[in-house]
């Protein structure tokens, strides 16, 4: 194997792929990146056995084909530290990788390409082409509500549900739920659900950087695959049953509050400073045309904010974890937001005013 490549051309796919590679690995080969030269294309592959990412780059010069694995982190650090306009020459000689650039020379240890595990590919049952920017928005609007290390392992991921002309993302940690839908060219009538693990979905969002570009998504029995011109991303799916999210969406709330998103966000942020550091509880008191927000903590410190809102219902007092409310307001983009409530023991439904492709549910807190 022997090829030359500009530093920039190598660094971009290398940084993408190195993001998947975990530093602490039980198998030494999993800390490595697989380099494969075929014709005038170099592909780089990283995996942690759950997520696999292949980055592709065209070589300008004719190259000698071959395949080898080298430590991902070290190769990336070397490339980062070279001058921007460096031309890198890489060849394999007697189980070592020799890298030359200008007056710099590096020799890296290698492991054979045969040792590198591949994610098993099953048949794909459903394929669709989506705009990268729309899929990224879908993920970013819902990923914050995923659980982190819940024993209910199916919550440590995101539900992707396809039905005719619609792709929907749902995530929940049992205390709050986020849901966002987009139109998608899907012919299939039946609903099809998959759960993508947390690391996989966050990694996928990181890859969708081309505002004009498309991405092809394949949903299989045990895998999801996303392909663009520059990369192929594969993730195993979580084997489990996601909760019936439609049962969680509050129905029939009769108290509608409309307020300025930024003003609410700032008021919640200020009040949060004096909320209980562990439970983060704040109290909302609604009356006609106004919302009072209160917090206190074990040190008997108190914060209170008053904010004007559009509200005409009866008065109501309800408690929430302020972090959950701030997370929701943080992903919304409209000037006005809707808050739909029914009573102090029922969940709140939050939506952007004038846009119902996203819905957020937050359970109340007893204060």
Regions found by a protein language model. Give the residues of each.
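Structural preference for solvent-exposed beta-strand-turn elements
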Residues: 1-367
């Amino acid at each position: 194997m022997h090829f030359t490549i500009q530093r920039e051309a190598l660094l971009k796919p290398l940084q993408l792929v190195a993001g998947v590679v975990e530093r602490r690995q039980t198998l030494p080969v999993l800390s490595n990146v697989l380099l494969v030269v075929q014709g005038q294309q170099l592909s780089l592959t990283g995996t942690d056995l759950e997520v696999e990412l292949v980055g592709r780059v065209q070589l300008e010069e004719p190259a000698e084909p071959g395949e080898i694995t080298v430590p991902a982190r070290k190769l990336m650090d070397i490339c980062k530290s070279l001058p921007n306009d460096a031309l890198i020459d890489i060849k394999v000689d007697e189980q070592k990788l020799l890298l030359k650039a200008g007056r710099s020379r590096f020799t890296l240890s290698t492991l054979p390409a045969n040792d590198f595990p591949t994610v098993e590919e099953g048949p794909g049952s459903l394929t669709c082409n989506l705009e990268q920017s729309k899929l990224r928005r879908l993920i970013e609007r819902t990923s914050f509500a995923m659980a982190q290390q819940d024993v209910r392992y199916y919550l440590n991921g995101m539900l992707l549900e396809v039905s005719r002309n619609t792709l929907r993302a749902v995530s929940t940690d049992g205390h709050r739920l986020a849901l966002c839908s987009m139109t998608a060219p899907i012919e299939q009538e039946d609903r099809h659900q998959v759960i993508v693990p947390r690391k996989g979905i966050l990694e996928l969002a990181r890859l969708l950087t081309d505002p004009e570009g498309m991405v092809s998504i394949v949903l299989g029995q045990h895998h999801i695959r996303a392909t663009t011109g520059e990369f192929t991303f594969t993730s195993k799916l979580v084997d489990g049953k996601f909760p019936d999210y439609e049962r969680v969406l509050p129905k029939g709330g009769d108290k509608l509050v409309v307020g300025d998103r930024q003003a609410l966000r700032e008021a919640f942020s200020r009040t949060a400073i004096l909320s209980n550091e562990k439970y983060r509880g704040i109290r909302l008191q609604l009356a006609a045309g106004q919302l009072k927000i209160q917090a206190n903590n074990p040190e008997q410190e108190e914060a209170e904010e008053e904010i004007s809102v559009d509200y005409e219902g009866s008065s109501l007092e309800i408690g929430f974890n302020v972090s959950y409310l701030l997370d929701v307001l943080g992903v919304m983009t409209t000037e006005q937001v809707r808050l739909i409530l029914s009573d102090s023991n029922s969940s709140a439904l939050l939506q952007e005013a004038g846009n119902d492709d996203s819905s957020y549910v937050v359970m109340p807190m007893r204060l």
